[in-house]
Design a protein with these regions (language model features):
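ER/Golgi luminal nucleotide-sugar-dependent glycosyltransferases, focusing on the catalytic module
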Residues: 8-222
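Short hydrophobic targeting helices and cationic amphipathic motifs
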Residues: 2-4
Protein backbone atom coordinates (compact mmCIF):
# COMPACT_ATOMS: atom_id res chain seq x y z
CA UNK A 1 0.00 0.00 0.00
CA UNK A 2 1.61 3.25 -1.16
CA UNK A 3 -0.13 5.38 1.46
CA UNK A 4 1.04 3.07 4.24
CA UNK A 5 4.61 3.15 2.92
CA UNK A 6 4.48 6.96 2.69
CA UNK A 7 3.12 7.24 6.25
CA UNK A 8 5.77 4.86 7.57
CA UNK A 9 8.50 6.87 5.84
CA UNK A 10 7.20 10.12 7.36
CA UNK A 11 6.89 8.66 10.86
CA UNK A 12 10.48 7.42 10.70
CA UNK A 13 11.77 10.98 10.35
CA UNK A 14 12.69 13.01 13.39
CA UNK A 15 10.43 16.06 13.49
CA UNK A 16 10.78 18.91 15.99
CA UNK A 17 8.73 22.09 16.35
CA UNK A 18 9.94 25.37 17.82
CA UNK A 19 7.09 27.76 18.53
CA UNK A 20 7.32 31.30 19.91
CA UNK A 21 4.50 32.87 21.93
CA UNK A 22 4.32 36.48 23.08
CA UNK A 23 1.64 36.65 25.76
CA UNK A 24 -1.03 39.37 25.70
CA UNK A 25 -4.82 39.69 25.38
CA UNK A 26 -4.85 38.34 21.82
CA UNK A 27 -2.26 35.59 22.08
CA UNK A 28 -4.46 33.04 23.86
CA UNK A 29 -6.85 32.83 20.94
CA UNK A 30 -4.02 32.66 18.39
CA UNK A 31 -2.31 29.93 20.45
CA UNK A 32 -5.50 27.84 20.59
CA UNK A 33 -6.07 28.19 16.86
CA UNK A 34 -2.50 27.21 16.04
CA UNK A 35 -2.42 24.20 18.37
CA UNK A 36 -5.72 23.03 16.88
CA UNK A 37 -4.20 23.26 13.41
CA UNK A 38 -1.20 21.18 14.49
CA UNK A 39 -3.55 18.46 15.72
CA UNK A 40 -5.96 18.44 12.76
CA UNK A 41 -3.10 18.34 10.26
CA UNK A 42 -1.59 15.28 11.96
CA UNK A 43 1.66 17.11 12.64
CA UNK A 44 1.31 17.07 16.42
CA UNK A 45 1.07 13.27 16.33
CA UNK A 46 4.02 12.99 13.96
CA UNK A 47 6.44 15.30 15.78
CA UNK A 48 8.75 14.22 18.59
CA UNK A 49 8.19 17.39 20.61
CA UNK A 50 7.09 21.02 20.44
CA UNK A 51 9.30 23.58 22.19
CA UNK A 52 7.16 26.54 23.28
CA UNK A 53 9.24 29.64 24.01
CA UNK A 54 7.14 32.13 25.97
CA UNK A 55 7.57 35.86 26.48
CA UNK A 56 5.42 36.64 29.51
CA UNK A 57 4.68 35.18 32.92
CA UNK A 58 1.10 33.89 32.65
CA UNK A 59 0.56 30.21 33.42
CA UNK A 60 -0.10 28.09 30.34
CA UNK A 61 -3.17 25.87 30.13
CA UNK A 62 -4.13 23.17 27.62
CA UNK A 63 -0.53 22.35 26.85
CA UNK A 64 0.15 19.53 24.37
CA UNK A 65 1.57 16.38 25.95
CA UNK A 66 4.67 16.80 23.81
CA UNK A 67 5.28 20.39 24.91
CA UNK A 68 8.60 21.52 26.32
CA UNK A 69 7.91 24.95 27.80
CA UNK A 70 10.53 27.64 28.31
CA UNK A 71 9.76 31.04 29.79
CA UNK A 72 12.20 33.40 28.14
CA UNK A 73 14.26 35.54 30.51
CA UNK A 74 14.74 38.52 28.18
CA UNK A 75 11.23 39.95 28.09
CA UNK A 76 11.37 41.37 24.57
CA UNK A 77 8.62 40.63 22.08
CA UNK A 78 10.89 39.20 19.40
CA UNK A 79 11.69 35.54 18.87
CA UNK A 80 15.36 35.73 19.88
CA UNK A 81 15.49 33.24 22.75
CA UNK A 82 13.26 30.73 21.00
CA UNK A 83 15.45 30.91 17.89
CA UNK A 84 18.48 30.54 20.15
CA UNK A 85 17.01 27.37 21.69
CA UNK A 86 16.38 25.99 18.21
CA UNK A 87 19.92 26.86 17.13
CA UNK A 88 21.49 25.12 20.14
CA UNK A 89 19.29 22.07 19.63
CA UNK A 90 20.32 21.88 15.97
CA UNK A 91 24.00 22.05 16.88
CA UNK A 92 23.57 18.94 19.01
CA UNK A 93 21.01 17.11 16.83
CA UNK A 94 21.94 17.24 13.13
CA UNK A 95 19.34 14.73 11.88
CA UNK A 96 16.00 16.50 12.50
CA UNK A 97 13.45 18.25 10.33
CA UNK A 98 12.57 21.44 12.20
CA UNK A 99 9.52 23.67 11.97
CA UNK A 100 9.77 27.22 13.27
CA UNK A 101 6.69 29.40 13.63
CA UNK A 102 5.15 31.88 16.05
CA UNK A 103 1.94 33.55 17.21
CA UNK A 104 2.07 36.10 14.41
CA UNK A 105 0.07 39.22 15.19
CA UNK A 106 0.01 38.67 18.97
CA UNK A 107 2.12 41.77 19.67
CA UNK A 108 -0.52 44.03 18.06
CA UNK A 109 -4.25 44.60 18.33
CA UNK A 110 -6.28 42.45 15.95
CA UNK A 111 -5.46 43.44 12.37
CA UNK A 112 -7.34 41.58 9.58
CA UNK A 113 -4.32 41.78 7.26
CA UNK A 114 -2.06 40.04 9.79
CA UNK A 115 -4.68 37.39 10.50
CA UNK A 116 -4.95 36.61 6.78
CA UNK A 117 -1.15 36.52 6.46
CA UNK A 118 -0.91 34.08 9.36
CA UNK A 119 -3.55 31.82 7.81
CA UNK A 120 -1.54 31.80 4.56
CA UNK A 121 1.71 30.89 6.33
CA UNK A 122 0.07 28.17 8.42
CA UNK A 123 -1.55 26.58 5.39
CA UNK A 124 1.86 25.84 3.88
CA UNK A 125 4.02 24.95 6.89
CA UNK A 126 1.33 23.17 8.96
CA UNK A 127 -1.44 21.89 6.68
CA UNK A 128 1.09 20.90 3.99
CA UNK A 129 3.79 19.74 6.37
CA UNK A 130 4.24 16.41 4.60
CA UNK A 131 5.13 18.20 1.38
CA UNK A 132 7.54 20.41 3.32
CA UNK A 133 9.50 17.54 4.80
CA UNK A 134 9.60 15.81 1.42
CA UNK A 135 11.15 18.98 -0.02
CA UNK A 136 13.79 18.88 2.71
CA UNK A 137 15.25 15.83 0.98
CA UNK A 138 16.29 18.21 -1.83
CA UNK A 139 16.54 21.60 -0.12
CA UNK A 140 17.91 22.96 3.15
CA UNK A 141 14.80 24.97 3.97
CA UNK A 142 11.18 25.33 2.86
CA UNK A 143 8.73 28.20 3.26
CA UNK A 144 6.72 30.79 1.39
CA UNK A 145 7.16 34.41 0.34
CA UNK A 146 10.92 34.08 -0.13
CA UNK A 147 12.78 37.39 -0.18
CA UNK A 148 16.45 37.87 -1.06
CA UNK A 149 16.90 41.38 0.39
CA UNK A 150 18.22 42.74 2.65
CA UNK A 151 19.23 39.14 3.37
CA UNK A 152 17.66 35.87 2.16
CA UNK A 153 14.62 35.02 4.31
CA UNK A 154 11.02 33.86 4.33
CA UNK A 155 8.88 36.92 4.99
CA UNK A 156 6.75 36.25 8.05
CA UNK A 157 9.29 33.82 9.57
CA UNK A 158 7.39 30.53 9.27
CA UNK A 159 9.50 27.75 7.75
CA UNK A 160 10.90 24.22 7.85
CA UNK A 161 14.62 23.43 7.73
CA UNK A 162 17.08 20.58 8.21
CA UNK A 163 18.82 20.87 11.56
CA UNK A 164 22.22 20.19 9.99
CA UNK A 165 21.70 23.39 7.99
CA UNK A 166 20.40 25.36 10.98
CA UNK A 167 23.58 24.44 12.84
CA UNK A 168 25.57 26.48 10.28
CA UNK A 169 23.63 29.74 10.79
CA UNK A 170 25.47 32.88 11.92
CA UNK A 171 24.72 33.15 15.64
CA UNK A 172 25.49 36.89 15.61
CA UNK A 173 21.94 37.34 14.32
CA UNK A 174 20.70 36.22 17.75
CA UNK A 175 22.17 39.02 19.79
CA UNK A 176 21.44 42.29 17.98
CA UNK A 177 19.01 44.54 19.85
CA UNK A 178 16.18 46.95 19.16
CA UNK A 179 14.14 46.96 15.96
CA UNK A 180 17.07 45.64 13.92
CA UNK A 181 17.28 42.70 16.31
CA UNK A 182 13.69 41.71 15.63
CA UNK A 183 14.39 41.80 11.89
CA UNK A 184 17.66 39.88 12.31
CA UNK A 185 15.83 36.92 13.87
CA UNK A 186 13.84 36.66 10.63
CA UNK A 187 16.91 37.12 8.44
CA UNK A 188 18.97 34.50 10.29
CA UNK A 189 17.55 31.59 8.26
CA UNK A 190 19.50 32.77 5.21
CA UNK A 191 22.86 33.12 6.97
CA UNK A 192 23.97 29.48 6.73
CA UNK A 193 26.80 27.94 4.73
CA UNK A 194 24.65 26.93 1.78
CA UNK A 195 21.25 28.62 1.70
CA UNK A 196 19.29 26.45 -0.73
CA UNK A 197 15.65 27.52 -0.33
CA UNK A 198 12.36 26.13 -1.60
CA UNK A 199 9.62 28.75 -2.01
CA UNK A 200 6.29 26.89 -2.04
CA UNK A 201 4.29 29.98 -2.97
CA UNK A 202 5.90 33.01 -4.56
CA UNK A 203 4.30 36.33 -3.65
CA UNK A 204 5.17 39.33 -5.83
CA UNK A 205 7.74 41.55 -4.13
CA UNK A 206 5.42 44.56 -4.44
CA UNK A 207 2.75 42.82 -2.36
CA UNK A 208 2.67 44.39 1.12
CA UNK A 209 1.05 41.93 3.51
CA UNK A 210 0.48 44.69 6.09
CA UNK A 211 -1.77 46.53 3.63
CA UNK A 212 -3.45 43.60 1.86
CA UNK A 213 -5.91 41.00 3.11
CA UNK A 214 -4.38 37.98 1.35
CA UNK A 215 -7.45 35.77 1.12
CA UNK A 216 -7.52 31.98 0.75
CA UNK A 217 -8.59 32.13 -2.89
CA UNK A 218 -5.03 33.32 -3.63
CA UNK A 219 -3.49 30.01 -2.61
CA UNK A 220 -5.87 27.18 -1.61
CA UNK A 221 -5.89 25.63 -5.08
CA UNK A 222 -2.08 25.40 -5.30
Amino acid sequence: DLNLKSSTKIMSKKLAIFYHLYQNELSGLIYQQQMHRLYTSGLMDACEFIHIGIVGEAEMFSLPEKARVQYNKRLTKDEGETVESMYKFSKENPDYKVLFFHAKGASRQFVPQLHAWRMFLEYYVIDKWRECIDKLEEYDSVGVKLRMKPYPHYSGNFWWANSNYLATLDENFLYTEGESGKIDRELMIGSGDRFDPCDLHHVHKEMNMYDTIFTEDNYLND
